[in-house]
Regions:
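Catalytic-core region of right-hand nucleic acid polymerases
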Residues: 223, 234, 243-368, 372-379, ...
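RNase H-like nuclease module associated with reverse transcription
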Residues: 578, 617-733
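C-terminal reverse transcriptase regions that engage the nucleic-acid substrate
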Residues: 293-296, 360, 368, 444-565, ...
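Mobile genetic element proteins and their domesticated derivatives, centered on retroelements
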Residues: 8-10, 34-37, 161, 212, ...
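Retroelement integrase C-terminal DNA-binding domain
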Residues: 1-213, 217, 221-222, 424, ...
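A short, polar/acidic, helix/strand-boundary loop motif
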Residues: 273, 602-629
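Catalytic palm active-site di-aspartate
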Residues: 308-313, 357-367, 391-420, 446-456, ...
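Conserved beta-strand/loop block within the catalytic cores
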Residues: 205, 210-293, 389-412, 454, ...
Length: 733
């Protein structure tokens, strides 16, 4: 059962102590003995590959957790492929406790899964689940699963009807498992440190156990839910209860060392009925990376003190309220037993199968409305302390201190960044947050950690930002072998070439490729912008990755390995808090003839607060037109930065836009085409003419050699030129 990170098992009904047969999930590769040993199993599961054995379906998760009857599950995605496809037989003896539970639950699994058919279930019925995979017509060979629950009819029981999962429901079920690959393994796309309770206890022992118990104790202390006594449960409540899952995570420091083992109970919000929330605004914003870097540049320029705060169990401080539909959640037996020892109300609610069903009173991670309710809660707290949001980023709030100084905070879910020259009022706000939420950890100093980044403010007038820990974890997790020579640039000259004959990646390789590209994108957008051009191209290849794409990914990894411990430095300098932009384009560089845009925004003299490297949406007829499109698209970003800084109290004069194409600048100055060769250009690309006329931006020509902040993000560059342009971009010595 994917929801418990175990396989789907089949057992011979005549067995006294059930043995099991491993079956194939969806259309993926058949599990091998090696894979079987690597997969996390509930206790010591007995496994027997017996080709002739009659078998029924055993849903381990349903056998121990009576819950919602939903089609958004993966336990029915099974296809009997025969023992001939299994590479090797693996047989293990179950523990006595496992055998007892399996024997007790073996004939109640279907009953628990189909609550509405309880009266029709018989203890000796045989359930056969067949999955017929139909080839989807597109080139990616997506599968649409037709799930048929075929209960062998008896004289007293007719055959049941067929149930069908459409493609969207199947995909939602798969996506709810982080990333469920066809070879029956789970990969997180960005964070690879999440573990199940069993994995965490195996790896970290009592530390993980204490973390899990601490999370449950926090839930009880916060009165997160009301347990429903078993006698008061109705079929509607049982059917509508969503599942829950305890995850354990290694919380890492920016230097790559383990900070702590953190546990979190997560609700399966993907099982909630979204039709009940139609018309409601469930969106929740977080502070943008551009805003954070701009605030750090301001702090460096004005020599502000910087402080971070982390609100523990943030969502639990927000109430679910009574205006919406009640949310019922099922808690698995192992966690239910711990809760029952902490609060007698949970002991009275334990059901025959060991689970507990609760009604959520506080917001829990995973519920579709939790993020919105928490944001409203924390924003109200800030409003009560006279903090006013920035109109262009509501997660940035300010107030004027008694001495006239500005106090600024940025909120990213439960992480808060504070900057001010007035330490007294910064401490007052921090104390108010602690009084409101209780469990708040804070840190201040010349070196602070925020959102996985290490920010060094020890040098007057500058802020240096690195993510050494994430770089190290990417390199460690990569399957790339170190090259024989040092890799001095992240992309070869053929980065945009596509070899249609290159063999495609399958299953695990494709999943690992997708995960690694996602992690690199997160890194490149923040502290390694010189890699962004290569990474942005690979993001277009994740659904159809080939061996050639894997080689391009390997080069980026080797570049990081050979050029580690780098970052960016924000230095506003004498120019002050003013927005500037470097815009460039590489004409016709993609295989479909489209051009590539590179853009870098700065606050003050040097250091990127926002970078972009994207494929243009149209085919242009000349390099001049490509540069015009790049300037038109990127000016949007620059104007947003200007508006943000103005709302922060920094009046903006004309923002400088650096360009290396004189013909493009001439077109913008005239605001129209100047010859037969440019008459076809759409008028929408000339809107920047108005911004020049109103003196919001001024165009300044720069030679290509000193356009590094944008040039390095449009085309592959090597040698001394790359080193020089990388320095111009990152401002890192």
């Amino acid at each position: 059962d994917p929801r418990t990170e175990a396989c789907v098992f089949l057992y011979p009904k005549e067995a006294t102590v059930p043995s099991f047969r491993v079956m194939r999930v969806s259309s993926g590769a058949v599990i091998t003995r090696t894979q079987l040993i690597q997969l996390p199993m509930p206790d010591a599961i007995a496994v027997s590959l017996d080709k002739q054995a009659e078998h029924d379906v055993l849903d381990w998760d349903e056998a121990t957790h009576s819950g919602k009857n939903t089609d958004n599950t993966c336990d029915n995605h099974v296809e009997d492929t025969g023992v001939d496809e299994v590479s090797r037989t693996a047989t293990f003896l179950p523990s006595s406790e496992t055998a007892r539970r399996l024997t007790e639950n073996v004939n109640t699994a279907s009953t628990a899964q189909h609550v509405e058919l309880i009266e029709r279930e018989r203890a000796d019925e045989a359930t056969h689940v067949h999955v017929q995979n139909q080839e989807h017509p597109n080139e990616e060979s997506e599968r649409e699963a037709v799930v048929q629950v075929d209960c062998t009819p008896t004289k007293s029981q007719p055959r049941r009807s067929q149930r069908v999962l459409d493609q969207e429901s199947t995909r939602e079920a798969l996506e709810s498992l982080n990333y469920w690959t066809e070879d029956m393994q789970v990969y997180a796309l960005v964070t690879s440190s999440n573990m199940t309770c069993r994995q965490a206890e195996s790896e970290h022992g009592s530390i993980a156990t204490d973390s899990i118990e601490g999370e449950l104790q926090q839930l009880v202390n916060k009165e997160f839910a009301t347990p429903i006594p078993a006698a008061e449960l109705t079929p509607e409540i049982i059917k509508g209860a969503i599942r829950s899952k305890m995850f354990v995570k290694q919380k890492m420091k920016p230097d790559g060392t383990i900070d702590k083992i953190k546990s979190r109970l997560v609700a399966r919000g993907d099982q909630q009925d979204r039709t009940l929330y139609e018309g409601e605004d469930l969106s929740a914003t977080t502070v943008t990376c551009m805003s954070v870097f701009s605030l750090l540049a301001i702090a460096a320029k004005e020599q502000r003190k910087v402080c971070t705060a982390d609100v523990g169990g943030a969502y639990l401080n927000a109430s679910m309220g009574t205006d919406g539909p009640p949310v019922y959640m099922s808690i698995e037996p192992s966690l239910a037993s711990i809760l029952s020892g902490m609060d007698s109300r949970y002991r009275e609610a334990i059901r025959d199968n060991g689970t507990i069903i609760v009604r959520l009173d506080k917001c829990l991670y995973g519920c579709i409305e939790s993020a919105r309710k928490w944001q409203l809660n924390v924003m109200q707290t800030m409003s009560d302390n006279n903090m006013k949001p920035n109109a262009y980023d509501p997660c940035v709030l300010n107030k004027t201190c008694r001495d006239g100084a500005q106090l600024t905070i940025a909120v990213y879910v439960d992480d808060i960044l504070m900057t001010s020259t007035n330490e007294e009022e910064m401490e007052e706000l921090l104390q108010a947050i602690k009084n409101r939420y209780g469990d708040v950890k804070s840190h201040r100093g010349d070196v602070i950690e925020f959102l996985g980044m290490s920010v060094d403010m020890s040098t007057t007038g500058s802020a240096s930002i690195t993510m050494k820990g994430m770089e190290a974890s990417i390199i460690e997790d990569a399957t790339t072998e170190r090259g024989t020579r040092k890799t001095n640039s992240p992309a070869a000259d053929d980065i945009f070439d596509i070899d249609e004959d290159s063999p495609p990646l399958h299953n695990q390789e494709r999943s690992e490729f997708h995960a690694m590209v996602a992690r690199l994108l997160y890194l490149a957008k923040r502290v390694r912008p010189e890699c962004l051009m290569a990474v942005s191209f690979l993001t277009t290849r994740v659904t159809k990755a080939t061996k050639e794409d894997k080689m391009k990914l390997d080069r980026i990894i080797n570049y990081l390995r050979d050029n580690d411990e780098r970052g960016i430095t924000l230095t506003p300098g004498a120019e002050g808090i003013v927005a500037s932009g470097y815009f460039d384009a590489a004409y016709g560089i993609h295989e479909d003839g489209k051009s590539h845009t590179g853009a870098c925004l700065t606050v003050g003299e040097r250091g990127p607060v926002s970078v972009e490297s994207t494929k243009q949406s149209i085919v242009t007829k000349s390099s001049t037109e490509a540069e015009l499109v790049a300037t038109s698209d990127s000016t949007n970003m620059l104007l947003h930065l200007r508006n943000f800084l103005t709302a922060q109290g920094y009046e903006q004069g004309p923002s400088t836009v650096y360009q290396d194409n004189m013909s493009c600048m001439s077109l913008i100055e005239k605001g129209r085409s100047t010859s037969k060769r440019t008459r076809h250009i759409a008028i929408r690309h000339f809107w920047t003419k108005e911004k020049v006329d109103t003196n919001e931006i001024i165009m300044v020509h720069r030679a290509t050699e000193i356009m590094g902040p944008a040039n390095v993000m449009t085309k592959p560059i090597h040698g001394a030129q790359f080193v020089n342009e990388r320095k111009q971009l990152t401002n890192w010595e």
